[in-house]
Amino acid sequence: MEIRGIFGVKVGMSQVFTTNNERLPITVIYCEPNQVAGVKTEAKDKYSATLLSFDTVENKKLNKPQQGFFEKNNLKPTKHLQEIRNMTGFEMGQQITPQNLFQVGEYVDVSAISKGRGFTGAIKRWNFKIGPLGHGAGYPHRFQGSVQAGRGGASAQRVFKGKKMSGHYGHEKVTVQNLRIVGFDEANMLVLVSGAIAGPEGGVVLIRTAKKKPGVVKPIELAVQTEKAPEAKPAKLSKKKQAKELAKAQAANQQTVEAKVDTPVVEPKPTEVKKAAPVVEKKGEDK
């Protein structure tokens, strides 16, 4: 089976609507172009794989062996280096984008590292039933109960390996199968995948060919959504606050009315036009 895959970063979740008015929850994944940093072959390495590098960083943030690897192969320094087995047909230094590997509606498997929850009890870790809270049950109520396997003799006097008990929970690889590619946002380098995937926001994600449905495509038609400004809803106030607001409004109206009555109306005076004095000529004066 031909394997295709690409690495990205989980951004978060959202939702879209189809033409049948069905709400479809989606996960948004940021996928910048992955560069091929190495090619493994059956003849030389006894297995076939493609080494991908992603998440470009400054060269000074890498250690000496990593800097030497990228300088030797004339590649951009990146934060992550990881290979995908049985992925063939690519050359050294080639840039891979999700649009080149998948199409809208194609089934894929998405792998990520789940959120780490530390040391947890059996109730949270294995969904055990909580103990009785009353009738003299006593404390604590969240014990997992007996883990005893036998009482001696022919019975085993030990706890078998794999027993569901308290312990470290989370921070493990989780793969969700048979999700579909809903769409691409080439301008922002985003991939929309149906459903939820493991891991926190900002976690590394692997999108690869579906193991159970390789190459199967089921088209998805999304409804065109027109963005509208949300209407401002009046705030709900209690009766006391409504009475206070009404009293303030009435007082403000009364003050404006009183101000209009008290202020005298001043009429503008008509402008007086000054006439020029007549010129009188004196007789009998020679210049």
Swiss-Prot record:
Pfam families: Ribosomal_L3. GO terms for cellular component: cytosolic large ribosomal subunit. GO terms for molecular function: rRNA binding; structural constituent of ribosome. Residues 269-287 have a biased composition (Basic and acidic residues). This is Large ribosomal subunit protein uL3. GO terms for biological process: translation. Keywords: Ribonucleoprotein, Ribosomal protein, RNA-binding, rRNA-binding. Coiled coil: none annotated. The gene is rplC. Part of the 50S ribosomal subunit. Forms a cluster with proteins L14 and L19. Residues 228-287 are annotated as: Disordered. One of the primary rRNA binding proteins, it binds directly near the 3'-end of the 23S rRNA, where it nucleates assembly of the 50S subunit. Belongs to the universal ribosomal protein uL3 family. InterPro entries: Ribosomal_uL3, Ribosomal_uL3_bac/org-type, Ribosomal_uL3_CS, Transl_B-barrel_sf.
